[in-house]
Amino acid sequence: MGVSNRLAWGCPTKEHLLPHFLEHLGNNHLDIGVGTGFYLTHVPESSLISLMDLNEASLNAASTRAGESKIKHKISHDVFEPYPAALHGQFDSISMSYLLHCLPGNISTKSCVIRNAAQALTDDGTLYGATILGDGVVHNSFGQKLMRIYNQKGIFSNTKDSEEGLTHILSEHFENVKTKVQGTVVMFSASGKK
């Protein structure tokens, strides 16, 4: 992750992505698309963390890496589907770090993912994360190669994803939307759910 973030995407983890993650972290947090659990190793011990991923192995690996004592719930769920009612209005913060560019479809088809997450936030909660853009940014040769390979293999689905498109789908569900592009990555936060 560190090598590709720095060299391919131009958005070093420790300088940009980790501070963004920690800045928006609430006391009762849901991490969606948990990956390796890297960010969770940096959360304060007092935080209540829940994990959501469709992949049980990822849930277990992230939970182990973060420390089981920090994990409140492990939720196996498809983010394109509405969340169980028990999750509605539960979380102060929800993160989607490098989730959106891995989901199938164009950016507009991912609007339901934002809507579903918004329902799980408290009224003053924040949805935030980062995603790799395919449109409106200039990829270096390493980034171009990875984009081509990952999109061909179906690991990514982001060739047309743009900051403008992301802002649009976030604004459909939130009053306050902020984005910042670093390299070919857009970091975002959204609050004031509609």
Curated annotation (Swiss-Prot):
UniProt-recorded Gene Ontology molecular function terms: methyltransferase activity
InterPro entries: Methyltransf_12, MeTrfase_VrtF, SAM-dependent_MTases_sf
Gene3D superfamilies in the cross-refs: Vaccinia Virus protein VP39 (3.40.50.150)
Domain of life, per lineage: Bacteria
SUPFAM superfamilies, A to Z: S-adenosyl-L-methionine-dependent methyltransferases (SSF53335)
More info: Encoded by the cryptic lambdoid prophage DLP12.
Name of the molecule in the record: Putative uncharacterized protein YbcY
Organism: Escherichia coli (strain K12)
